[in-house]
């Protein structure tokens, strides 16, 4: 989240860092400042607290099953570098980088946040076709 907001004013970055620090310590933040509710609303805080307990690279190392790491090249929330770190931690995993795919598994020609949000909010846009075919192939191969 902090990476995603790195272009925001320092006061916003500091506020986000403070909230994240509390959540990482397992503490709920009852009074989220105006404008931060979408990211840190009360209903999502328990999930975030549980999420911060895990190191994805460590977790993936421990898996004893076939792993497919799927990453959209136009995802503005989880970066290609994050997927590459997972692959490095689990060399036997399959890494699938998909052109134009964003965080909600749809095609988006840009990483512009406003255009991404329009794609996020458009239920008529289909899931990326490469994802569907690749996921199907991976499952069939591993049966």
What are these regions (language model features)?
Residues 68, 94-96:
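A structural signal for isolated positions on well-ordered beta-strands in alpha/beta enzyme cores
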Residues 63, 69-71, 75:
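Short beta-strand/loop motif that positions the catalytic acidic residue
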Residues 65, 78-89:
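Short alpha-helix in the alpha/beta-hydrolase fold that links the catalytic acid
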Residues 58-61, 84, 88, 133, ...:
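Solvent-exposed, polar/charged alpha-helical surfaces in well-ordered, non-transmembrane soluble domains
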Residues 94, 101-143:
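Catalytic active-site module of serine/aspartate enzymes centered on a nucleophile-bearing elbow/loop
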Residues 1-50, 54-57:
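Accessory cap/linker subdomain of secreted extracellular hydrolases
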Residues 74-78, 103-104:
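Acidic catalytic loop of the alpha/beta-hydrolase fold
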């Amino acid at each position: 989240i902090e990476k995603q907001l790195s272009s925001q004013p320092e006061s916003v970055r500091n506020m986000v860092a403070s909230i994240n620090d509390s959540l990482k310590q397992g503490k709920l933040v009852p009074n989220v400042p105006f404008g931060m509710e979408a990211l840190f609303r009360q209903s999502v805080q328990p999930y975030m607290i549980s999420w911060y307990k895990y190191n994805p690279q460590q977790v993936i190392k421990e898996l004893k099953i076939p792993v497919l790491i799927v990453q959209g090249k136009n995802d503005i929330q989880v970066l290609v570098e994050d997927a590459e770190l997972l692959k490095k931690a689990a060399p036997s995993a399959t890494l699938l980088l998909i052109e134009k795919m964003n965080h909600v598994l749809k095609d988006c020609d840009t990483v512009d946040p406003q255009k991404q949000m329009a794609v996020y909010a458009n239920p008529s846009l289909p899931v990326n076709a490469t994802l569907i075919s690749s996921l199907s192939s991976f499952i069939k191969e591993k049966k």
